[in-house]
Structure formats: structure tokens, C-alpha cells
């Protein structure tokens, strides 16, 4: 695998591409971590630290991206302090939504690195290509079958992790012909409860999952047709930070894509896709000591399509047009079984539907003096409705006048300028405006228990769209052996959606301290910085370092929840012939700006060290690769600020992997 790291100076911090024996630096408009068939790339070993790493591990090392951790599995992406409905997460351009009211199943858990070709990240309001957003976007691009290659290629590997007695099996294969190709991959993971830095077992941290993907690609003259199928199923997934675990989490994805590459003077390429995905999630408390057993299933089904075209309209203008539509249906239920009475039923997400149609246009303009400007805009029309019946009747208790159907328009407009100055510097500036829709949970949620602040949450169908005004400034320096980039950003969010205590309402969950209701507050603000460094002083030595941090508060000066501390990761790598070694230093500053209103506590800083090594060799059958390492070398007891419930991170972990390629 080769990982190419492109960082938008305005929105992230650097872009680096390693060629066969030299570093080439470009500055583009997004972060991309891209997989191709090689093991010789510096950044692969930074982002995907070992072959047992999952998608969440890779995301956590990207600048501007963080994770809310409730377990060893099912971690929720955060972009510059924004998460949930504030950001867009797509799988190969497909809209997809989790089915858990407790956010145990962000859609990123349903894909594995072996499924992926690339991860694209755009930060802030500039990430609106695939949907209106205020916080940014992540698009996980699926790997494609490769045509015109050796007829059959593939790999198989096994990994082991001592901290959780975890096993990871993976395999993929590509069958190639001149006009067609087929790809299949399979992954199996199983981990027991892990131990923290004090040697104590973190109960309910186990998980098991399987992942299968199939893809076909056919060349028809200048056209390409692709078909994708992916199914991912997790079982017996523990969540130590929550009062319930997950019995089953299953997602299925289907897609058919048409691509046309032309020699036309004006139309460069056209891509159209139709897709569907289904998510089922079943919470489980059968292994917990509870006062009352509950069944809590959830469903989320999405169907959609898009068309995307790039047009060379004028000599110095490249236009992108995209139109898309999706329809989502979500439902979550709860059945309670009191020990001394009849069962009780409620809908924690009342059955609701959302249809969104949008259009996006961008103009990339080349101006004299190597100045490059990108202007983009998006308009979405959304129709959200709640189904007549039980779920709607629940909300009538609180909102007797609310409308069954909510219609809203969301808008975004962004401008970015990039200017090389002197010989080795690049300046970038971005200003933008964006809006986002309230989520179905924020609109219709019914007594959703939040373990972090011990409150029940109720939605508000009268919410307005949340807005954001954003600006970024970046500066970069590069030469043959050094790349240094820094970015500062600021966002002002009017009508920020936040939940506040309603003292007029009584909690339903036993032990809950009260009820919170979502509302629009006047505003909130976010600011922070990101920094990256890549040094290659010698052919065999590379140093990579990333630093990122965000601060956020309301207009009243109250800290916002889920804001990470400043974090750094530094990696020093040595390669010689068939051997490599890598030393990493990871750490974070203390977070003393915690949101006590949302159950947060100040978090101390930490530093940990990781040591990795690898060796590869060839024989007539193919290539063998061996790797081993020690993570958290000093067995440090620590946690990060976004780790719910004070649950500690794993202690010292010895891992090893063996892989064969043919």
C-alpha cells in the first residue's frame, strides 16, 4: 500500500507524494490517503502504522481529524471539534447514516483499509461537494479492480495483538483481463477485553467482525462500468463507556457506477452512480447488571444517485458540476421489560424520512503570477417528515403544534486563493459560508439517554439550520529535503445547535439527572491551528511530525463539549535494503477547557512511544512481509479528552503480522 498525503494549506497542512526514490511536493485542495500496490512509501508507515490497523486508526493520524472513543470499536470522527450532523461522511460518494441512537455505529466502522483506495478529507465549510456542511467532509473511496495487470494477483495476511489477544485475518484478490477485472476482499477481526497501562482489564471492550467486498469493472470503448457490493457485520461488541453493548451491527452497500472519459475539448469526464445501503443495529444489555432489560434495535436505509462532470469551459477555467439526491428512512425502537409488569414500547427515533436534492458548482481559475483561485457554491433542498402514528404522537406531548413535514434550503459559498511566493513559499487563504440541517435525532429524538452527562435528550422539530462563517490562512515552505506547513483557522457559527436542561421535564431513564432539549443558541466559535513537518535529510531516513488543536466556546464563554486537546505525532523512520525501523512519539497537552455542563472533566496530558520494525523478502512464489512492534512502550496509563467515561487507553501492546503477496 502506498499512502499519498495531500493537505490543503487552508484546511489541513501539507501534501506530500513520494516517488520511487525522491520526494515530490504538490499543494492541492484536499487531504488524500491513497492505496496502491507498493510497500515502499514513507507516509503509509505514518498513517497505517501496522497492517492490523483499522480505518479509525488511520483517520486518527490525519490533521484536523479526531475520534470520540466509547470503546475499542465504533469510534466517531470529529473534524476540528465538529461531529455528527455538522460533518459529512460518505462511502465512495454515497450518503450513509448509522442506525444507533447512541452513536455506536458511525459509518466509518463499516469499511476496512483493505476495502479502500483513498480517504479524502476537506475541512470546514469547504467540504460541501457531496452535501451541505459546516464542519467538513470525509469520503472513503472504495478500491477498484485493476485491469490490464497480471491475470491474478492478491495477498493474504494474519496479525496478532497481545493487549487484547486479538486476531486479524485478511485477504484480497484481483482477476484482470483486457476489458474487465474483478476484485474480492475478506477481513475477520476478533479481540478480547484489552488491558490498560496498570494491567487492569477493561471489561466490555471486546469485539468481533467480518467484512466482505466484491467489485467488478468493465471497459466499453471509452466508457467504464463498475459494480460494488460490500457487507460488514460486527457481533458481541463491548462499549465500556456506555450502559449497553452491541449484539449485532450490520451494513450492506450496493452501487452501480458509469464513467466516461472523453477527448472532447470541453467535457473532461463524467461520472454517474446509483446506490443503496442498509444499516441494522441491535443494542444488547444481556451481559450487564441492569434494573430492567431493554431491546433497542435501529434501522437506517438510504437510496441515492449523483452525476458529476468536469468541464474545461475556457482556457484558464475548469468547472465542476455535481447534482445529487438521496432518500433516508430511520427508525429506532425500545422495548422495556420490567420485572414486575408488562413490557413497554416506545420509538426513540420515531419513523422519519428525509429527501435531499442538491447542486454543486466549482470553478478552478488559473490567473497570472501563478495565482490560483477556486470558487464553489452549493444549494440543497431538503424535505424531512415524520410518519403518522406512534412516534409522532409521542412528540405531540411536547410540541402539539408541530408540522409533520419540514422543508428547508441550505446554502454554501466558498473562495480559496493559493499563491506561490519567492522560490519556496506558498500562501493560501480561504473564506466561506455554510449551513447544515438538524439531524433526525436533534429534531425527533425521544428520551435518548446520554451516559456522559447522565441526562435524557429530547429533539426539537422547530430547530433552525445551523450556520457557519469560516476563514483559514496557511503558509508553507518546501525544498528538496524539507516541507513545513502551518494553518490557522477561525469559524463563527450562528444558530449553533446545543442541548440545554429543561427543568420542567422529568427524566425517564432510572438514575438520569434530568432532561435536555435541543435548541439554537445565538452562536459559537471555533479556532485552532495545524502544523506539519516532513524532513528527509538522507535517502534512508525520514521524519514526519503533525500537530493539531482546536478551541471552542459559546458566546457566553462556556466551553463546548467534544473539543480535543492539542495533539502531536512524530515518526522517525529508517529503511535499508529489505529492513525498516520506526520510532514514534505521540502525545497531547492537558485539556483544561472542559465542558462541565456536558459531563466532561479536565484531562491530563500524556506522552507515549511506539517502536516498529519490518522485513520483506521475495521468492519464486511471491513476496513475504514480516512486521512486529511495541505500542505504548512504557506501559503508560492514559486517556485522551474525547474518550468517554474516563475509560483508559490500552497499555503496552506487542503486535506482529505476516503477509504474503502473489
Describe every region a protein language model picked out:
Residues 20-49, 54-56, 84:
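Short, acidic, small-residue-rich periplasmic hinge/interaction motif at the N-terminus
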Residues 51-59, 75-78, 90, 106-111, ...:
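N-terminal periplasmic accessory domains that precede
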Residues 95-124:
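Short acidic/polar hinge/loop motifs at secondary-structure boundaries
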Residues 215, 298-309, 348, 352-358, ...:
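Outer membrane beta-barrel strand-and-loop segments of large Gram-negative receptors
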Residues 367-369, 373, 381-382, 489-493, ...:
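Gram-negative outer-membrane beta-barrel transporters
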Residues 492-495, 499, 543, 589-594, ...:
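C-terminal beta-signal and adjacent terminal beta-strands/loops
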Amino acid at each position: 500500500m502506498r499512502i499519498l498525503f495531500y493537505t490543503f494549506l487552508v484546511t489541513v497542512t501539507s501534501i506530500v507524494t513520494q516517488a520511487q526514490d525522491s520526494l515530490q511536493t504538490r499543494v492541492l485542495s484536499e487531504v488524500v490517503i491513497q492505496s496502491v500496490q507498493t510497500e515502499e512509501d514513507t507516509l503509509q508507515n505514518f498513517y497505517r502504522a501496522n497492517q492490523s490497523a483499522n480505518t479509525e486508526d488511520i483517520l486518527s493520524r490525519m490533521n484536523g481529524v479526531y475520534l470520540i472513543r466509547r470503546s475499542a470499536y465504533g469510534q466517531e470522527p470529529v473534524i476540528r471539534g465538529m461531529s455528527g450532523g455538522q460533518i459529512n461522511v460518505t462511502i465512495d460518494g454515497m450518503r450513509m447514516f448509522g442506525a444507533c441512537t447512541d452513536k455506536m455505529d458511525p459509518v466509518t466502522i463499516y469499511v476496512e483499509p483493505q476495502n479502500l483506495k483513498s480517504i479524502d478529507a476537506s475541512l470546514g465549510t469547504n467540504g460541501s461537494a457531496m452535501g451541505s456542511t459546516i464542519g467538513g467532509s470525509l469520503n472513503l473511496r472504495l478500491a477498484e479492480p485493476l485491469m490490464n495487470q497480471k491475470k491474478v494477483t492478491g495477498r493474504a495476511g494474519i496479525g496478532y495483538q497481545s493487549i487484547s489477544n486479538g486476531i486479524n485475518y485478511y485477504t484480497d484478490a484481483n482477476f484482470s483481463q483486457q476489458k474487465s477485472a474483478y476484485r474480492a476482499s475478506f477481513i475477520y477481526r476478533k479481540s478480547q477485553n484489552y488491558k490498560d497501562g496498570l494491567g487492569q482489564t477493561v471489561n466490555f471492550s471486546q469485539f468481533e467482525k467480518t467484512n466482505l467486498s466484491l467489485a467488478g469493472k468493465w471497459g466499453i470503448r471509452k466508457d467504464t462500468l463498475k459494480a460494488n457490493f460490500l457487507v460488514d457485520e460486527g457481533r458481541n461488541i463491548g462499549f465500556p463507556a456506555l450502559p449497553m453493548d452491541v449484539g449485532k451491527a450490520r451494513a450492506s452497500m450496493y452501487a452501480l457506477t458509469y464513467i466516461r472519459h472523453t477527448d472532447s475539448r470541453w467535457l473532461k469526464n463524467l461520472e454517474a452512480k446509483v446506490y443503496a445501503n442498509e444499516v441494522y443495529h441491535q443494542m444488547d444489555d444481556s451481559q450487564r447488571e441492569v434494573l430492567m432489560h431493554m431491546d433497542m434495535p435501529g434501522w437506517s436505509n438510504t437510496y441515492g444517485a449523483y452525476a458529476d462532470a468536469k468541464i474545461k469551459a475556457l482556457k484558464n477555467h475548469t468547472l465542476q458540476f455535481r447534482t445529487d439526491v438521496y432518500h433516508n428512512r430511520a427508525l429506532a425502537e425500545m422495548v422495556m421489560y420490567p420485572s414486575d409488569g408488562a413490557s413497554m414500547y416506545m420509538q426513540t427515533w420515531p419513523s422519519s424520512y428525509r429527501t435531499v436534492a442538491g447542486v454543486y458548482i466549482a470553478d478552478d481559475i488559473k490567473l497570472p503570477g501563478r495565482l490560483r483561485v477556486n470558487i464553489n457554491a452549493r444549494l440543497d433542498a431538503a424535505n424531512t417528515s415524520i410518519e403518522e402514528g406512534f412516534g409522532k404522537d409521542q412528540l405531540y406531548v411536547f410540541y402539539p403544534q408541530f408540522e409533520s413535514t419540514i422543508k428547508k434550503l441550505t446554502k454554501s459559498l466558498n473562495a480559496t486563493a493559493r499563491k506561490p511566493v519567492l522560490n519556496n513559499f506558498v500562501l493560501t487563504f480561504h473564506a466561506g459560508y455554510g449551513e447544515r440541517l438538524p439531524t433526525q435525532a436533534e429534531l425527533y429524538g425521544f428520551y435518548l439517554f446520554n451516559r456522559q452527562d447522565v441526562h435524557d435528550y429530547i429533539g426539537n422539530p422547530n430547530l433552525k439550520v445551523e450556520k457557519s462563517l469560516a476563514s483559514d490562512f496557511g503558509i508553507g515552505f518546501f525544498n528538496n529535503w524539507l516541507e513545513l506547513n502551518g494553518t490557522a483557522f477561525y469559524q463563527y457559527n450562528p444558530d449553533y445547535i446545543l442541548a440545554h436542561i429543561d427543568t420542567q421535564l422529568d427524566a425517564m431513564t432510572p438514575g438520569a439527572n434530568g432532561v435536555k432539549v435541543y435548541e439554537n443558541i445565538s452562536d459559537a466559535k471555533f479556532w485552532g491551528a495545524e502544523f506539519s513537518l516532513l524532513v528527509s535529510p538522507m535517502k534512508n531516513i525520514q521524519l514526519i511530525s503533525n500537530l493539531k488543536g482546536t478551541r471552542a466556546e459559546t458566546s457566553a464563554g462556556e466551553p463546548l463539549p467534544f473539543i480535543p486537546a492539542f495533539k502531536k505525532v512524530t515518526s522517525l523512520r529508517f529503511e535499508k535494503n529489505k529492513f525498516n525501523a520506526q520510532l514514534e512519539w505521540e502525545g497531547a497537552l492537558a485539556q483544561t477547557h472542559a465542558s462541565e455542563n456536558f459531563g466532561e472533566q479536565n484531562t491530563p496530558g500524556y506522552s507515549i512511544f511506539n517502536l516498529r520494525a519490518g522485513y520483506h523478502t521475495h521468492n519464486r512464489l511471491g513476496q513475504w512481509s514480516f512486521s512486529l512492534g511495541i505500542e505504548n512502550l512504557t506501559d503508560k496509563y492514559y486517556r485522551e479528552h474525547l474518550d468517554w467515561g474516563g475509560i483508559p487507553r490500552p497499555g503496552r501492546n506487542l503486535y506482529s503480522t505476516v503477509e504474503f503477496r502473489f
